[in-house]
Amino acid sequence: MRVAIAGAGLAGLSCAKYLADAGHTPIVYERRDVLGGKVAAWKDEDGDWYETGLHIFFGAYPNMLQLFKELNIEDRLQWKSHSMIFNQPTKPGTYSRFDFPDIPAPINGVAAILSNNDMLTWEEKIKFGLGLLPAMIRGQSYVEEMDQYSWTEWLRKQNIPERVNDEVFIAMAKALNFIDPDEISATVVLTALNRFLQEKKGSMMAFLDGAPPERLCQPIVEHVQARGGDVLLNAPLKEFVLNDDSSVQAFRIAGIKGQEEQLIEADAYVSALPVDPLKLLLPDAWKAMPYFQQLDGLQGVPVINIHLWFDRKLTDIDHLLFSRSPLLSVYADMSNTCREYEDPDRSMLELVFAPAKDWIGRSDEDILAATMAEIEKLFPQHFSGENPARLRKYKIVKTPLSVYKATPGRQQYRPDQASPIANFFLTGDYTMQRYLASMEGAVLSGKLTAQAIIARQDELQRRSSGRPLAASQA
């Protein structure tokens, strides 16, 4: 079968990869001139990369890790020590660690929590552990039921002290979905905790050894092309052209950069667009369908990614750091953590600015000033005295609508990958799969979409038999 896919983010590329593996011919159409969607990156005038986000790969990402294995690029993951490292706001410039020993789960997670005496008291640890028991015993069904509560509401329901939220979960909620624990669904945090506690290396983290478009997305493209498929850039989806029965007749691809507008016909069609632009493109004939109406309950969350190049080393820590700043989420010195960005003498900090709803419309200068004020608290030793560290340059990447905002009650709005339109499918981390808004969720959704298309293969081929499948000029 020939399958047209709109969007070359991880979900669209994953879908194409697994369709190609099954002997089908996926053609991916990407609006921009760069691969990756939410993992896109660009080079500046000096040849330095700047990215859409700070992308972390966890041991609890089975589909992502399987993808790396199938592409034979596992060596591109740079695994870090099995730890979680938090800044201590009351002791600027110092850190508190949760170190996971090399013993089976969940004992290693329990040991990591119990051995940290900087952030939680013994009473808080015990109450937190008791509060988690229902999730650990009842598993995913309980985790899904808790979507009715925010994380803060769930903590109170379980009689877990507020200070546990302040010390640990403000930072974790911002890392998971770029919002505070008062807003994030308990399902999101419990899903992460369940994976971290039930899998020995679930919370172990890796960085990619370079920019995602080159080091992860391009190998997928080459894999697809080697099997007869293709990925085309500068090819934005303009319209779903429908048949009389509301099925898809063609993708209308806009003509940009001197290209002609095209009508793309295929046996099956996939939207791998984020949920917000997809809603803008929905044909009137589909808008009354409950399946598509549920998308109105989903909306992307704003996030800002910041890159700061300094004239000296600010830290030698080769790991992700939880800032515990009111403005910043996680950060890392990419000159330590990423092989391609390595610099033994100068730091390049990449930081996630979240929650960003009050800042996404502000100027880059305002955002930089606020960020630098926080940086001076994180690294006070480098910004005092006669020779303070100097910022050489910076890049700020704003994403007004990133992954779907995982507030309570969102699970009911997440659609299945197979739509009620016989030849139309959705893929993306917002579709229903257990890994929520994440790179793992995107890859898994792509795989599930490919499986859904293959399951409808006979029907799809019957529908399109006798019809030319080539592209034509509109």
Curated annotation (Swiss-Prot):
Enzyme class: oxidoreductase
Subcellular compartments: Cell membrane
GO cellular component: plasma membrane
EC number: 1.3.5.5
Inducers of expression: Up-regulated by light.
Keyword terms of this UniProt record: Carotenoid biosynthesis, Cell membrane, Herbicide resistance, Membrane, NAD, Oxidoreductase
Pfam families linked to this entry: Amino_oxidase
Notes on activation and inhibition: Inhibited by the herbicide norflurazon in a non-competitive way.
Membrane topology label: Peripheral membrane protein
Pathway assigned to this chain's UniProt record: Carotenoid biosynthesis; lycopene biosynthesis
Top-level taxon of the source organism: Bacteria
Any one of the GO BP annotations: carotenoid biosynthetic process
Result, substituting residue 403 to G: In strain: NZF4; confers resistance to the herbicide norflurazon
Record bears the keyword Transit peptide: no
Catalytic reactions of this protein: 2 a plastoquinone + 15-cis-phytoene = 9,9',15-tri-cis-zeta-carotene + 2 a plastoquinol
InterPro entries the UniProt entry points to: Amino_oxidase (IPR002937), FAD/NAD-bd_sf (IPR036188), Phytoene_desaturase (IPR014102), Zeta_carotene_desat/Oxidored (IPR050464)
GO molecular function, a single term: phytoene dehydrogenase activity
Miscellaneous field: Can also use NAD(+) and NADP(+) as electron acceptor under anaerobic conditions.
Chain's role: Also active with phytofluene and 1,2-epoxyphytoene as substrates.
Protein family membership: Belongs to the carotenoid/retinoid oxidoreductase family.
Protein name, per record: 15-cis-phytoene desaturase
Lineage: Bacteria, Bacillati, Cyanobacteriota, Cyanophyceae, Synechococcales
